[in-house]
Amino acid sequence: KTFGGRASGPQPLVDLFTYAVETFRGAAGRRLSSLECHDLACKIGEVVVVGGVRRSALISLSNPSDGRLRGAKSGQWWLTEGQRALANNSACYTEKPEFDFFLSEMKALYESKSGERGIFNRQAAQDIAAKNGRRDPAFDFGTNPCSEIILRPNQFCNLSEVVVRQGDTLKVLKSKVRWATILGTLQSTLTDFRYLRPIWKKNTEEECLLGVSLTGIMDHDTLNTPSPLLVKWLRELKEVAVETNLEWSKRLG
């Protein structure tokens, strides 16, 4: 009766096995389609639950020309393919497509009424990674499910969330950012992924990412309105995160 306090039992896993067997049998003699692979990944995410609470998030990056994924959330998909709710979907390109692509993509997005697919520019991700000189841009980057963080293949994000309350002062927010940064810095050292391939550990340790995010900004008068004061606050909060990370990185060696 508490959050995360009750086991889900074996049924979600049984459902996954049944779904996988049916999918493979339906594709006998051929390769799985991109949409079948997408659905199978979503189904795996669907069974990652604790106490009936979802504990997974996915993003599916597909070729611009992939019509199957473009239409994955068109019509009343939730009635027959409910697992697709687990993933955000985006078209991923490395070279600027022709105008026709954007036109057809926006038309499909509007007609689906789901707000998807999004668009992810891999070349822009490489340019941003190279911009500050601290990351190796020579990767086919993807992104985390909410698309805040550029990621290598086989890599985790490391995001700590600050909950903003309506009456929070700058001093209160700085304190929250400091604690979130401490948690994130500690979490960045947890790289013993014993059930994953070594490449996951290598990438996570090499980049040692840290992200501190603000949620609830629309409830706060300063944070929800573009202004010079907002810019000042955000810069000061960023400085707190950077300084706290440096302090705790030294402590941790």
Name each region found by the language model.
Residues 52-96, 188-201, 205, 209, ...:
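Internal maturation/activation junctions in enzymes
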Residues 1, 39, 43-60:
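N-terminal nucleophile
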Residues 13, 33, 37-40, 102, ...:
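Active-site-proximal structural scaffolding
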Residues 1-2, 111-224:
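Function-dense linear segments that define catalytic or interfacial modules
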Residues 43, 53-55, 87-88, 102-107, ...:
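Short, well-ordered loop/turn elements at secondary-structure boundaries
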Residues 1-39, 128-131, 135-140, 157-161:
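Catalytic alpha/beta active-site cores
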Residues 11-47, 90-99, 105-109, 117, ...:
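Alpha/propeptide regions of enzymes that mature by internal proteolysis
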Residues 95, 99-106, 111, 118, ...:
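Conserved mixed alpha/beta core segments that line enzyme active sites in large multi-domain catalysts
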